[in-house]
Amino acid sequence: MSRFQRLTKYVAIGGGAALLLAGAAYLAGAKVNTTKSIPVGLYWKSNAPVEKGAYVMFCPPQVGVFSDAKERGYIAGGFCPGDYGYMMKRVLAAKGDEVAITDAGVRVNGGLLPHSALIKADPSGRPLPRYQSDSYTLGTAEVLLMSDVSDTSFDGRYFGPVNRSQIITVIRPVLTW
C-alpha cells in the first residue's frame, strides 16, 4: 500500500469517527450556537426549569413576524413547525414582570436592558418589525426572550413575548468564547 493510500485510509477513518462522535453528542444533548444572540459555543440540553436568566432553545411560533424574518434570512429553515430553525435566546422577563418596549430599548420592571435599543432597519436598509408596548405585564405562560450580548440580535424587542410552550429546552453553556 502506498503512502498516499495509507494517509487516505487514516483520514477516512478519522473523519468517520469524528462524524460518529459528533452525531452521538448531538443525540445526547449537545448544541452548538454560532449566532450573536448568546455567547458562541457549545451548550448542553438541560432539564432545568425555564426561569429568568436561563438560556433556552425554542421554535418560533408560526406568525407573520417570524415568516418575514425567515424570508429575509434573520432565522434559518429547520425542523420546527413552519420549517423554521430553532432559536437560542436568554429569558430576561417572565410571569408578572412589567415590560416596556420603546425606541430607547426594553425595560423590565423599570430597568433598561443592555443591548436592547431598537434598530430601525437591517443592513440591507429594510425596516425591521416593531413590537410596541409602552407597558405590559407578562402572563403566566409568557416569557421575553432576548440577547444580552448583541445589539443586532433578532429578539423580543422585535417579536414581543413568546409562549412557554414554544420552548424546547433549557440549555447550559459548556464552552463559550
Curated annotation (Swiss-Prot):
GO CC terms: periplasmic space
SS bond list: none
Keyword presence, Signal: yes
Signal peptide interval: 1-30
Single GO term (MF): serine-type endopeptidase activity
Signal found in the keyword field: yes
Compartments, record wording: Periplasm
GO process annotations (BP): signal peptide processing
Keyword set, alphabetical order: Conjugation, Periplasm, Plasmid, Signal
Entry similarity comment: Belongs to the peptidase S26C family.
Function: Required for donor-specific phage sensitivity. May be involved in pilus assembly.
Protein's name according to its UniProt entry: Plasmid transfer protein TraF
Encoding gene, per UniProt annotation: traF
